[in-house]
Amino acid sequence: PYRPATCIRKGKRVNSTKKKPCPLVRPGPSRTVKVFVDDSYYPSPTRPSGWRSGYEPYVVRPVRSLGIDGSYTNDSSAGAAAYFATALRSHGLNGTNKGRRSAGTAEELSSYQGATLSEQVKYMLQVSENNVAEMLFRNTAIARGYQATWANSTKAAQEILTELGVPLTNTSLASGSGVSRNDRLTANSLTTMLQRVANSADYPELSSIYYGGGMPLAGRSGTLNYTAGRFNTSPTRCAAGKLRAKTGTLFDTVGLS
């Protein structure tokens, strides 16, 4: 027997807790469930210009449309499938990962709505998650009606920045995370972007990045938390709780904006 993670009580599905655990269930005859993944929402992974092979997968993983938060593997879709198969086994089903297959006209049995866009952006900024940044870069292209290629993602991002009045002279956007050595931003373009983000009256759709806790707060949250060695010394403590900024860290490069 096993204890399921959820159960039905008084007509409602509730979580199993220590105080009110769901009743044990004795599984019936073993049933095998084949798990396939369809990650065709993005093209097969390639590297953009300036993206060093040594970065994969520990700095940033190959960009696929499926993955698990915090998982740095060469095949994030396979990792997601394995995770789901394991979850099925915890519910008494013999889930086995069978690789990729197009969903085609398969019947939809269930669906799940993940984090909202603002939640994804907040998470990406707080922990400096390169993988989420790259997925958002691809999704920007799709939102503009383009195929999710590197070139189209760059094109879509440049279109949006131009609409926001951000100067793009002497800038280069090769990747969404900034990992590419060919990414270039000027002080003018960066400060203009930050001004737009902080201007909630004229750009309410961007306000959550600054006012909604998106950008880390000095000495308080995310990659600027004092436990990470940020703003915890006598010369810097004065900015704790007052400054919002974004870190940028590679093997030999450290930035703060």
Label the model's feature ranges.
Residues P1-G70:
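Periplasmic/cell-envelope proteins involved in peptidoglycan metabolism and beta-lactam response
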Residues R52-S53, E159, A245-K246:
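Intrinsically disordered, low-complexity segments enriched in polar/charged residues with Gly/Pro
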Residues G28-S30, V59-R61, V166, T236, ...:
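A generic structural signal for short, non-catalytic loop/turn and secondary-structure boundary residues
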Residues S175-G176, R181-S257:
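C-terminal soluble interaction/assembly domains
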Residues V14-S16, S44-R47, A103, A151, ...:
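A short linear-motif detector with a strong N-terminal bias
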Residues P4-S16, R26-S30, D69-I209:
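A small/polar active-site loop signature that marks catalytic segments
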